Every structure is written in structure tokens, then in C-alpha cells.
Amino acid sequence: RVDKMDRKYDAFLIFDADNLVHPQFMLEMNDHLEKGESVIQGYLNSKNPTDSWVAGTFSIMFWMVNHMWHLAKYRIGLSTALGGTGMCIRTSIIKEYGWDCTSLTEDMEFSMKLLTHGIKTTWAHDAIVYDEKVTTMMASCKQRLRWAQGQFDCADRYIPKLFAAGIKQGNIVILDGILQVSQPYFLLLTTVYLVFSYINAYVPIYTNILYQIMPMSVWQIIGIGQYLFPLIVLLKIKVPPKIWFYYLLYPIFVYSWVPVNILGWFRRHNKEWSHTVHTRAVGLGDVKLTRMGDMNKNKK
């Protein structure tokens, strides 16, 4: 229908209905389109991080992933992935490849589909969209279960395709996509490893070769890093004071991924959609939002 309109558009922007959008979002996306980028994900911020400890810890996770994963990969020339909202896709991409995604995480699937053709998903760090985070643990688990199901499904289908395309084209960016789509499996393997490590500490049944490669103290430092990195990000974006209390509860949220991820694996072939209810009706001027002034500073 859009293709038949008299006015033609260079790209599509996709948002969730509950989102708040930074006034300079379109300007930033246009800058990225001018650079020749075709599939772009904006910065996924939170509009209600202080509503509850669940919303707060959920927001911390998104902030950390934005800075430590998406931005980092973009800066070194690797592909990231679409996040379901705050997305910009060039019209020519839709015309050539369509959408045709069937998993519960169709945003991730679309990124992986394009990556097999050598098309990267890039990151617009200053194109900010404020998404509503769920406020209860039950709603959070339900939403994350849907994500886990979709990500496992997507991994099963696209790891072989990415490997074949990456080897055939000799493209490290495509091969790196395997790491992107394999994250739920990494968490699953980490869970199994931790369980056996605890058992082995009391009833030695095997030799841990990881401790032979590097001292246990080094692995402990790596483990501490998962809580140190969010701290660095929170200091950088100047979060509301209440978030610092939620930061103390962040480990609870992190480990709550374990049962969700395990259940997601068992249900990875179930494609029944579960709706996430959003009720937080606020405007840009109604709440204190992080990074509202960042882009103005960057433009000076």
C-alpha cells in the first residue's frame, strides 16, 4: 500500500505504540542514512525506570547492552541486531528482501536474514527511543520467555546459514553474527557449567581445565565484571537516585534469566504470541528521562 502512494519514502521507522521518541530521533537516523547505512537500530532507553525494582533492573540491563554490546560492536565495524522498536529500515531493503519472518523474535530474525546476505544492522547511539518496561516479575518472566523461545528458534535456524555464508564469503562480520544469535545457548551452557562447578567443589568428579588455563582469581574477576560494567554505564548516563538501590538488586534479575532461559529452550518450537500489557501513559515532559540532553551536547 505504501509503495503505491504518490510520495516515495527513503526508509521506514518502526516504534511500539507506547514509546516516547526523542525530538532529534529522525535527524539522527537521517544522518545514518546519509552515511549509506540501510538497517539501523536506535538507542533503547526506558521511560519508567523508577516505577518498580523490576522496571529498574530491566532498564539497567538495556542500558548496559546499549553501551557495552551494541555501541562497541558498531564502533569496530561488526553488525548488531534490531531490537523491536526504534528501528529504521531503508525502503530498498524491504522491497528486495521483504519481511517474511516467522519467529517470536522477528526483529532478530530479520537482522540475521540480512546478515547472511552481507547486510549489517548498524547502531544509532544518539537516536533515542524511550520504551516502557514491565513492572512485575511475573510480566517480566512472561515477556523474557517469549524472547527466549524466539531466540532459540532463530539460533537453530540461522547458525548453520550464517556459518555457511560467512565461510563462503570469507566475511568475519557474518561469522560474528553466530555469537549474536547464540547468546541464549551461551547462557544455557553457563548454567550447566555453574551447576557442575558447585557439585565439583564438594564432590570432586572432574578436573576443570579452565582453571588450568588461567587461575581461579582471574575467572572471579571476569565474573565480577558483569556487575562492574553496569556500574560504569550508570555513572555515565546519570541515572535517577532510585536506580542505585535497584542496582543492588540487579543480580537477582540476572539470575532470574536462568529458569526463563531453560524453559524457553524446551518451548523453542512454540510460536504462540503472548501479549505484553503496557499502561504507563506519560509524555516527554512528565517524567525525568536519561540522556535527554546528550544529543544537544554532541551537536555543539
Task: Identify what each model region corresponds to.
Residues A11-F15:
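Short aromatic-hydrophobic micro-motifs that form the base-stacking/packing surface
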Residues K133-Q149, H275-V277:
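Nucleotide-sugar-dependent glycosyltransferase catalytic core
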Residues W63-H67, C141-L162, Y227-L231, V260-G264:
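Catalytic core of nucleotide-sugar-dependent glycosyltransferases
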Residues L104-F110:
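Acidic donor-binding loop at a coil-to-helix junction in glycosyltransferase catalytic cores
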Residues S111-Y130:
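Catalytic donor-sugar/metal-binding loop of nucleotide-sugar-dependent glycosyltransferases
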Residues D16-L20, D100, L114:
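The conserved acidic donor/metal-binding loop of glycosyltransferases
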Residues R1-D10, P23-Q24, E28-S103, L145, ...:
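Long helical/loop segments within the catalytic core of UDP-sugar-dependent glycosyltransferases
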Residues Q180-N270:
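Membrane-embedded multi-pass helical conduit in multi-pass membrane proteins
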